[in-house]
């Protein structure tokens, strides 16, 4: 039997918060470590400097992504909490005005003036703050961010993504390593694009094109910088 709970669970929007952080982390891990390695490889004749730079970049990048995601999402959560507290205060100080605002919101969505007011009254009697949080502020259980979840998803995904180019660095020939890294990275990005598109229910073709174009630009510029300095390590 279909209920509102199991029906909503089947939608992709429930995955949006952690999926965004995970895709960002994995994409950044693949491109950052590959670009860093390509830049060093373009100016190096030995494997050790490439490995050292890549491992350092992997550790620093994963911690930076996790910390940055946590701080960013926490700021969003703090803003939401501040708005909720403000709304609760306004409901106590000017309940009639808040009721009229709620009715106007429903009226703009297509209800008649009388029906909109009736809906606003009934929702206010049941849970006034919840109604205003949801319909006036646009905050709900699905859209609310989770700082810890986002930080873990982003940091873990960066690490996993960064391990793929690191394997190439460890086993590919030093001569021409840039080309090995580029090819393997593009393949990894395509796989990531497919997984992200399937998980989020979006277009696979668009995801692949978007992710490979930006990946190619990042690695190309990194290789250019390495060749530009041309310093042999």
Predicted regions span which residues?
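Interfacial loop-to-transmembrane junctions
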Residues: 191-216
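Juxtamembrane boundary at the C-terminal end of a transmembrane helix
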Residues: 223-233
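Cytosol/matrix-facing amphipathic helices and coiled-coil assembly/linker segments
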Residues: 1-14, 73-155
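Transmembrane alpha-helical segments and their cytosolic interface motifs
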Residues: 18-37, 141-167
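Alpha-helical transmembrane segments of multipass membrane proteins
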Residues: 60, 64, 161, 165, ...
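Internal alpha-helical transmembrane segments
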Residues: 1-72
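Structural signature of hydrophobic alpha-helical transmembrane segments
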Residues: 175-187
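Alpha-helical transmembrane spans of integral membrane proteins, capturing the lipid-embedded, hydrophobic core
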Residues: 57-58, 155, 159, 186, ...
